[in-house]
């Protein structure tokens, strides 16, 4: 028979990790279920060396460092962690919820869903032969290995701009974007414009030039024009964002808004006892940032505690008084 937990957290990214830690402060019995093979979510797997700019008080904090600190914080408590385990169904029983996964079942009094954007994979560069080239990349695991190399980055969002600024410190860097304007933080765009990064706008990649294994040059074409240019490069990084899939979420009986779980001011979904935090939840004015999700975690945990035992106050003691 499965153990009965007070809170089961679905998702082991930064927001889920902090929710688990905070739940322990409320002396809840908590576990984490994550479909990925490691904790940390996108920052750990896709952006381990990228600076995280929206966690206050920690300048130059990388995705890997953020993950390690959250795990270290959680290590002081007994937290069962189930990795490579996908949640298939969440069914309301009389007194608890039964969670069916790809590996078994779990019983829990409440559920906090912190699954981010769900399963994710990078949006690919769609040019002939792209799969054959070994020096086309979609994420960076060790930036120092590219020191002194000619780097070209495709994209116009925060990731593309941030990586261009990071690579500029160690390598000749070119940034190619199909529009004149970048979809990144204003401060980052200003830093880009003041940097030594070569900016090519509005251009789109049109042809890969190499021996079929190593890409040597990238042909780019000006948007709405026949004008072309050729860029010499050693490595090409594609930052076109990610395709995400919420998988079985639509089968869990929760009210959704464009694949996000609608929550109230308690972070509670349409099903009492099930809460959602981070990028997977929706409410009017919602901003998808790590900092936002970290703030939502205590709200969900405290209301889950109150759901389990209405005599427990939603507003707990401050951590400084514990």
Curated annotation (Swiss-Prot):
Residue sites binding FAD per the record: 34, 42, 47, 87, 120, 279, 320
Keywords noted in UniProt: FAD, Flavoprotein, NADP, Oxidoreductase
InterPro entries, per database record: FAD/NAD-bd_sf (IPR036188), FAD/NAD-binding_dom (IPR023753), Fd--NADP_Rdtase_type_2 (IPR022890), Ferredoxin-NADP_redctase_2 (IPR050097)
Cross-referenced Gene3D superfamilies: FAD/NAD(P)-binding domain (3.50.50.60)
Protein's UniProt keywords contain Transmembrane: no
Reaction equation(s) it catalyzes: 2 reduced [2Fe-2S]-[ferredoxin] + NADP(+) + H(+) = 2 oxidized [2Fe-2S]-[ferredoxin] + NADPH
Domain of life the protein comes from: Bacteria
Record GO biological process: cell redox homeostasis
GO molecular function: ferredoxin-NADP+ reductase activity; flavin adenine dinucleotide binding; NADP binding; thioredoxin-disulfide reductase (NADPH) activity
EC number, UniProt record: 1.18.1.2
Cofactors that this protein relies on: FAD
Cofactor note: Binds 1 FAD per subunit.
PANTHER family xrefs: THIOREDOXIN REDUCTASE 1-RELATED-RELATED
Protein family according to the UniProt entry: Belongs to the ferredoxin--NADP reductase type 2 family.
Oligomer status and interactors: Homodimer.
Name of protein: Ferredoxin--NADP reductase
């Amino acid at each position: 028979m499965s153990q009965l937990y007070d809170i089961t957290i679905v998702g082991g990214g930064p927001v889920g990790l902090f929710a688990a830690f905070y739940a322990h402060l409320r002396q809840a019995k908590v576990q984490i279920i994550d479909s990925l093979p490691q904790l940390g979510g996108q920052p750990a797997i896709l952006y381990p060396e990228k600076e995280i700019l929206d966690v206050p008080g920690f300048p130059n904090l990388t995705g890997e460092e953020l993950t390690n600190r959250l795990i270290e914080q959680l290590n002081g408590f007994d937290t069962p962690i189930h990795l490579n385990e996908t949640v298939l169904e969440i069914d309301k029983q009389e007194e608890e919820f039964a969670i069916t996964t790809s590996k078994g079942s779990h019983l829990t009094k409440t559920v906090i869903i912190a699954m981010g954007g769900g399963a994710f994979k990078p949006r690919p560069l769609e040019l002939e032969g792209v799969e054959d080239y070994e020096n086309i990349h979609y994420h960076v695991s060790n930036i120092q290995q590219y020191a002194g190399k000619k780097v070209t980055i495709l994209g116009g969002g925060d990731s593309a701009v941030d990586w261009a600024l990071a690579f500029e410190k160690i390598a000749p860097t070119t940034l190619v974007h199909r529009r004149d304007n970048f979809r990144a933080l204003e401060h980052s765009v200003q830093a880009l414009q003041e940097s030594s990064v070569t900016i090519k706008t509005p251009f789109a990649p049109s042809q890969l030039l190499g021996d079929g294994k190593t890409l040597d040059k990238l042909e780019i074409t000006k948007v709405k024009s026949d004008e072309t240019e050729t860029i010499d490069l050693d490595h090409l990084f594609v930052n076109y964002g990610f395709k995400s899939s919420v998988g079985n979420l639509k089968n869990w009986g929760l009210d959704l808004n464009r694949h996000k779980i609608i929550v109230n001011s308690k972070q509670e979904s349409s099903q009492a006892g099930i809460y959602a935090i981070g990028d997977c939840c929706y409410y009017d004015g919602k901003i998808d940032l790590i900092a936002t999700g970290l703030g939502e975690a205590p709200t969900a945990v405290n209301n889950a505690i109150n759901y389990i035992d209405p005599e427990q106050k939603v507003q707990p003691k401050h951590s400084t008084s514990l």
